[in-house]
Amino acid sequence: MKELLLWLYGKSARNAHIRDMAEKTVVLLKEKGSMEYQELAQALGIQFNQYKKPKRTFYFVINPLKKIQLIQDKRIFTDKSKKKYKTVYFFNPDAFYGYMKRVLDEFHSEIKV
C-alpha cells in the first residue's frame, strides 16, 4: 500500500502527513465498511475549527483515492425534497481491482508492438 500512496501523493516530505491520513482512511474504511463525512474527517484528525482549510485538506486526501476507485462515496438524502444529504464513504477493493486491471491492460496494449 505504501508504494501506491507514493504514486498518488508523491514523495515530498510536505505530503507525508497527507499520505499518513490516506493510509489511515483506507484502514478505517476497511475495518468499518462505511463512514459518514464528518465521522471520517474527525477520525483523520481534521478539526474544522483548527485547520485553516479543513475541507481542502479532507478532499486532498480523499480525491486521489476516489479517482482510482479504492473508495467511493454515496449521497444519502435526509429529507424528501432532496436538498439535504449526508455523504457516506465506503471501501471498494473490487472496483479498485477492476480499475487497475483496465489501466494496465490499456497500457500494455499501447506499448505492445
Please name every model-derived segment:
Residues 34-46:
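Short acidic, hydrophobic short linear motifs in intrinsically disordered regions
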Residues 87-113:
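Short, amphipathic alpha-helical interaction segments positioned at domain boundaries
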Residues 66-78:
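A short, conserved structural fragment
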Residues 50-68:
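Short amphipathic alpha-helical interaction segments
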Residues 14-19, 33-37, 51-55:
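Alpha-helix N-cap/helix-initiation sites
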Residues 27-31, 45, 70:
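Short, locally clustered residues in the helix-turn-helix/winged-helix DNA-binding domain
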Residues 80-85:
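Short acidic/glycine-enriched loop/turn segments that link adjacent beta-strands
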Residues 1-31:
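Short alpha-helical segments that sit at the start of domains
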